[in-house]
Amino acid sequence: MRPTIYYRWWWLMRGDDVTYLQQQLAAKGHNPGTIDGIFGPKTRDAVLAFQRAVGIGVDGIVGPETWGAIEAKVQDPGEGLNYIKFTRGRTEYYLLKAEKNKIKVDILGEPRKLQKLSSMAKGYRAAISGMFFYNTAPIGTLLRDGWTWTTEHPNYWTVDLDNWKLYEKGFSAITLLREGVKNCISGQPKLLPSTHRPDSASLEGRGPRCALGWNAGKIFALVADGRSSASAGATFPEMAQVLRELGATYALGLDGGGTAQMIYNGRTVNNPSDGRERPMPMGLGFKMK
């Protein structure tokens, strides 16, 4: 077990573990300064930047949580798309981080049909579960290539998947089509830039969660496991905080619970709370442009 490393200006920690830490930070793109085995201000700043990037507690202290993230295997299923698993508190998280200029996000599924995400995601680098649904219809506004197959809901926000613009509640498919939107999905609650309460009390507690975030250059898909001894689950405000620390400026909650799922490189990487895949009407697929 590696020691906890932290910064004290009057006595700088040093040694082989610090050297290893500096090497790992440099390999992950966070400049620790000179790799000299001394935990100085430059190395602490690199730790802070790393903690923000992976969505763990940002305190500059290299304890068990940060060591776990440092030594986690970050996997790249294709240029511009990274996958990482990390733990924060008592919850396991799964993250896809995509470059907008290299990765396209497609709406998967067929109207009035429930399918496993693994079936819908064939041929894609990665995929996540999508919109809330009732029977076989997604709830909210969904447009794919200008066609809709959803049950609209006035309390759902909508994101344009081509231009990555977030629309407030109440925009109908017809209104969005007039705005030039061709591909969009809906969800709730809005998480960023400000976090709203969900419209259902059943969504306010801790549980398996799924969310989509983005900024000017990146897309973040985040899934949290829950309802198990291995992972307590997350609240939507906690999902918002993780996405904010990752750098997202906008974020939207998606269907969670037993539906929350992430696929990377052809396999489910999280642990759906039902113990198996739950069929759903649609999902989101990530592929190279």
Question: Predicted segments — roles?
Answer:
Residues M1-G37:
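Acidic, Ser/Thr/Pro/Gly-enriched interdomain connector segments
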Residues Q22, V47-F50:
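Conserved hydrophobic/aromatic packing and binding residues within compact polymer-binding modules
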Residues L25-G29, Q51-V58, V74, M131, ...:
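Sec/Tat-exported extracytoplasmic proteins
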Residues I38-R44:
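Phosphopantetheine-attachment site and its flanking helix in carrier
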Residues R44, P64-W67:
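Short, well-ordered surface patches within globular domains
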Residues G68-K289:
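Gly/Ser/Thr/Pro-rich low-complexity, intrinsically disordered segments
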